């Protein structure tokens, strides 16, 4: 984009409630990429005004997620910055001052109405306009005194201006709202606690946010915020109103908006499932943006270089788990053997396949085995099943029940018996010698097709139908362990 200000400042402002959602990650990613592309500032603040729902556990999960993904922030928790504090729960004096200044200039008014009274008036009038009806906008001194005598405590509402509000949305183009359909809205609770409707724009103003990139679900709140920004500018609190861009919905199964209840929505679960952070980010970037029409796989450096918010597609994007796994698999193929080995180690240790620390013999065996599986695993967790058979002792070795039932039947055991006889005669225990012996005995002598010949042997030795290459695996496993497993498969 050619007309960007010299200093771009964007923010991510999650609420620490519940498990972080992939929609949060997509929004954070687009803000991060936008800031990095324009050599700007990525601000991270915590919207914890909902004291009942905000938890330390959720905050820790958000920090953990951002660190794992490599979405580094320039200002915010744990790094500080010129606009600290970055927790809304610690900025109460700032919000109270803003409220007082808004009230002094008559941008707000006290509202004593109950929800029941508002609903009753709407039903009585037959109005179809939802929200507050402005009843308390111009209370007389007597009316106010009467409400106070009843012990009512008011909320503070912002006076929406007459007319219409138009802005150029960075994703959707020009958007206009008639303010008669945007009711006066509350800025704080009756107990004085500020609401999101106040603290979000006030924080953006004080932190000098230039661009607000957020989900489409917040589109309808934008005219309210633009009106509030105009007031904050008049009061000298805001230097300017930020530009807005509303990102497309992420849809789940059945073409419904992906919700926190959907299993694929939980962002940290992808780490547990063995996704690479770069693979997950690449896929989430595709939910509304593309680096090129004929290209899906790219690095974050490439995304930063190419990212333009104007290229974001406003239409809803559908979350496709198969596509996500395919993108992750492509990134797995880009890893060097050393890096892939480093990435799978925590999963192998966590599953008990390897000790912590890894003993020297297992380290050497892993280095020999990784080239066999590097092109076969699509997620880091798959290394456990693919490599586990090499490291487990014979007393703990097990076979997949379904695979054993299918391939180690009477015909399969007959193949295993002949394989055992042939391999017991092998002198040098090497990949080539193992392959030659089994090929001669099972395929040529028995006349069994290779698939039917080697499948039972594979399950007998590795425990699974899917494994690294059989002959190489048997060489790594060694003569004694390979023959022992063939014997145990015969019962």
Swiss-Prot record:
It comes from Nocardioides sp. (strain ATCC BAA-499 / JS614). One of its GO terms (cellular component) is cytosol. Catalyzes the attachment of glutamate to tRNA(Glu) in a two-step reaction: glutamate is first activated by ATP to form Glu-AMP and then transferred to the acceptor end of tRNA(Glu). It catalyses: tRNA(Glu) + L-glutamate + ATP = L-glutamyl-tRNA(Glu) + AMP + diphosphate. This is Glutamate--tRNA ligase. A motif ('HIGH' region) lies at residues 14-24. GO terms for molecular function: ATP binding; glutamate-tRNA ligase activity; tRNA binding; zinc ion binding. It is found in: Cytoplasm. Its EC number is 6.1.1.17. PANTHER family: GLUTAMATE--TRNA LIGASE, GLUTAMATE--TRNA LIGASE, MITOCHONDRIAL-RELATED. Its cofactor is Zn(2+). SUPFAM superfamilies: An anticodon-binding domain of class I aminoacyl-tRNA synthetases (SSF48163), Nucleotidylyl transferase (SSF52374). Binds 1 zinc ion per subunit. Zn(2+) binds at residues 111, 113, 136, 138. Monomer. Belongs to the class-I aminoacyl-tRNA synthetase family. Glutamate--tRNA ligase type 1 subfamily. A motif ('KMSKS' region) lies at residues 257-261. Keywords: Aminoacyl-tRNA synthetase, ATP-binding, Cytoplasm, Ligase, Metal-binding, Nucleotide-binding, Protein biosynthesis, Zinc. One of its GO terms (biological process) is glutamyl-tRNA aminoacylation. The gene is gltX. InterPro entries: aa-tRNA-synth_I_cd-bd (IPR045462), aa-tRNA-synth_I_codon-bd_sub2 (IPR020751), aa_tRNA-synth_I_cd-bd_sf (IPR008925), Glu-tRNA-ligase_bac/mito (IPR004527), Glu-tRNA-synth_I_codon-bd_sub1 (IPR020752), Glu/Gln-tRNA-synth (IPR000924), Glu/Gln-tRNA-synth_Ib_cat-dom (IPR020058), GluQ/Sye (IPR049940). ATP binds at residue 260.
């Amino acid at each position: 984009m050619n007309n960007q200000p010299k200093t771009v400042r964007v923010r991510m402002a999650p609420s620490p409630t519940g498990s972080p959602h992939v929609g949060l990650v997509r929004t954070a990613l687009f803000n991060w990429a936008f800031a990095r592309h324009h050599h700007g500032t990525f601000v991270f603040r915590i919207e914890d005004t909902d004291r009942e729902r905000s938890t330390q556990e959720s905050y820790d999960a958000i920090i953990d997620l951002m660190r794992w993904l490599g979405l580094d922030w320039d200002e915010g928790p744990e790094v500080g910055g010129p606009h600290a504090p970055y927790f809304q729960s610690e900025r109460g004096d700032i919000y109270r001052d803003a409220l007082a200044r808004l009230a002094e200039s008559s941008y707000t008014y006290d509202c004593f109405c109950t929800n029941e009274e508002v609903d009753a008036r709407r039903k009585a009038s037959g109005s179809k306009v939802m929200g507050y009806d402005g009843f308390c906008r111009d209370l007389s001194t007597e009316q106010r005194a009467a409400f106070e005598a009843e012990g009512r405590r008011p909320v503070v509402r912002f006076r929406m201006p007459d007319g219409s509000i138009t802005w150029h949305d960075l994703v959707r183009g020009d958007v206009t709202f008639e303010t008669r359909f945007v009711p006066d809205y509350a800025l704080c609770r009756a107990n004085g606690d500020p609401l999101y409707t106040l603290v979000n724009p006030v924080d953006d103003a004080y932190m000098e946010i230039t661009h607000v990139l957020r989900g489409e679900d917040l589109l309808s709140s934008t005219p309210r915020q633009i009106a509030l920004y105009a007031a904050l500018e008049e009061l000298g609190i805001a230097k300017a109103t930020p530009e807005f861009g509303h990102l497309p919905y992420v849809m789940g199964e059945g073409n419904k908006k992906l919700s926190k209840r959907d299993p694929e929505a939980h962002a940290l679960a992808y780490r547990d499932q063995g996704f690479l952070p770069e693979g997950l980010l690449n896929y989430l970037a595709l939910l509304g943006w593309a680096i090129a029409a004929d290209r899906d796989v790219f690095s974050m450096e490439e995304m930063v270089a190419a990212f333009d918010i104007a290229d974001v597609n406003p239409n809803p994007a559908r979350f496709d788990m198969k596509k996500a796994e395919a993108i992750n698999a492509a990134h797995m193929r880009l890893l060097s053997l050393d890096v892939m080995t480093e990435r799978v180690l925590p999963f192998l240790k966590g599953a008990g396949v390897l000790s912590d620390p890894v003993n020297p013999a297992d380290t050497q065996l892993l280095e020999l085995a990784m080239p066999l599986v590097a092109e076969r695993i699509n997620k880091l967790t798959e290394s456990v099943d693919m490599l586990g058979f090499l490291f487990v002792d014979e007393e703990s070795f097990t076979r997949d029940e379904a695979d054993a039932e299918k391939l180690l039947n009477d015909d399969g055991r007959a193949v295993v018996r002949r394989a055992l006889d042939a391999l017991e005669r092998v002198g040098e225990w090497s990949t080539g010698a193992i392959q030659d012996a089994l090929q001669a005995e099972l395929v040529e002598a028995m006349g069994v097709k290779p698939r039917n010949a080697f499948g039972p042997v594979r399950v007998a030795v590795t425990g699974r139908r899917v494994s690294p290459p059989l002959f190489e695996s048997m060489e790594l496993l060694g003569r004694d362990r390979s023959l022992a497993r063939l014997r145990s498969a015969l019962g």
